[in-house]
Amino acid sequence: MSVLLFGVSHRSAPVVVLEQLSIDESDQVKIIDRVLASPLVTEAMVLSTCNRVEVYAVVDAFHGGLSVIGQVLAEHSGMSMGELTKYAYVRYSEAAVEHLFAVASGLDSAVIGEQQVLGQVRRAYAVAESNRTVGRVLHELAQRALSVGKRVHSETAIDAAGASVVSVALGMAERKLGSLAGTTAVVIGAGAMGALSAVHLTRAGVGHIQVLNRSLSRAQRLARRIRESGVPAEALALDRLANVLADADVVVSCTGAVRPVVSLADVHHALAAARRDEATRPLVICDLGMPRDVDPAVARLPCVWVVDVDSVQHEPSAHAAAADVEAARHIVAAEVASYLVGQRMAEVTPTVTALRQRAAEVVEAELLRLDNRLPGLQSVQREEVARTVRRVVDKLLHAPTVRIKQLASAPGGDSYAEALRELFELDQTAVDAVATAGELPVVPSGFDAESRRGGGDMQSSPKRSPSN
């Protein structure tokens, strides 16, 4: 079984396609369930951000697994399979490992080196793990990807500028307006992205921030934090948006809503009320939602300048220094090689364990025959014979089992495990039973502070029945 990746990202598709594919957390669970309904798929995890939708799965067959995942995503998006595949990319086995390591390191982000994606990978794993849809393979892959991402950020300067989608978008806004100092800003959405936007706006010296959110209490919490940093701020319900826009200079919208929250009518109303002049006071709107928060028609209005995810990735400040990128890629390559060696050795371990179990069974059978032939044998003598026989077997098996693990670490090493099974007539069922017995280690079930406090163990059986 190998890891298969089916994905669509900002590098392969325009924003309008990513909008159709956008997946919230409840959708993740449904998609995983549908993928796992196929007997060809044994583990699955969905990574969904504003820039990508990727399904990682452990499959028994490449083409069959690809068809299953592609069909599920096509039905979710409303696109035909043929239309979806025009924008999709596929990675298999080693290439899938390399891709996830690069993603976790920020090398495949719209803003190269940004750290937010590391948390998004962590969250994707946590969702899959809490729903028991990851087994040994994806557990080890996700954990290693998180480790690689942390190593890249600690050993290189790829994130030295502290760039993120938010910081780059606001940098573009600042360039358009000349300065953000003293301006009036509106933040739509009080989640993690909204909070990050508030931090950057505060540092830029804006004069006033208005926070709008469907949940007024969340908007009030964020507004309170902004005021504590020394910037006047107030929280408003989302239905006040049209009036708020009239006084705004810069707007950051990042709600995760399924349809636009900033309508053409809202912006028309704001422009009419403010009597703006495009040259002296444009309205800059940073649309960082996926699907888009801003009606696409808004970008065609005079006096309005819209920054979206597409424009962010083409901004020069979104790209880290070439030397840092190269250093990060070297780390990823080394980590991929190390990971694959470990996986190959892990794959041969059940065969070696099954061989040792077979040898132990033979020893016990022969000792039983000895008891039947020499019933008068004293217990001290029998124990000495048993120790001697076991030592002989251990010595005979030691060198070949150590050597086969070494050989198995090289590409194509799985053939040695197969040869061992053939030579000693090891039943594949017995080998699989050994592998399944140690499917997953017991680890905390979450990554954030709440899940650590709550505790919980990994489940030994990765695949659960799909929900109805």
Curated annotation (Swiss-Prot):
GO terms for molecular function: glutamyl-tRNA reductase activity; NADP binding. Pathway: Porphyrin-containing compound metabolism; protoporphyrin-IX biosynthesis; 5-aminolevulinate from L-glutamyl-tRNA(Glu): step 1/2. Residues 458-468 have a biased composition (Polar residues). The record marks H99 as: Important for activity. GO terms for biological process: protoporphyrinogen IX biosynthetic process from glutamate. NADP(+) binds at G189, A190, G191, A192, M193, G194. The active site is at C50 (nucleophile). Transmembrane segments: none annotated. InterPro entries: 4pyrrol_synth_GluRdtase (IPR000343), 4pyrrol_synth_GluRdtase_dimer (IPR015896), 4pyrrol_synth_GluRdtase_N (IPR015895), GluRdtase_CS (IPR018214), GluRdtase_dimer_dom_sf (IPR036453), GluRdtase_N_sf (IPR036343), NAD(P)-bd_dom_sf (IPR036291), Shikm_DH/Glu-tRNA_Rdtase (IPR006151). Substrate binds at T49, C50, N51, R52, S109, E114, Q115, Q116, Q120. SUPFAM superfamilies: Glutamyl tRNA-reductase catalytic, N-terminal domain (SSF69742), Glutamyl tRNA-reductase dimerization domain (SSF69075), NAD(P)-binding Rossmann-fold domains (SSF51735). The keyword Transmembrane helix does not apply. Keywords: NADP, Oxidoreductase, Porphyrin biosynthesis. Catalyzes the NADPH-dependent reduction of glutamyl-tRNA(Glu) to glutamate 1-semialdehyde (GSA). Homodimer. Belongs to the glutamyl-tRNA reductase family. Possesses an unusual extended V-shaped dimeric structure with each monomer consisting of three distinct domains arranged along a curved 'spinal' alpha-helix. The N-terminal catalytic domain specifically recognizes the glutamate moiety of the substrate. The second domain is the NADPH-binding domain, and the third C-terminal domain is responsible for dimerization. This is Glutamyl-tRNA reductase. The lineage of its organism: Bacteria, Bacillati, Actinomycetota, Actinomycetes, Mycobacteriales. The gene is hemA.
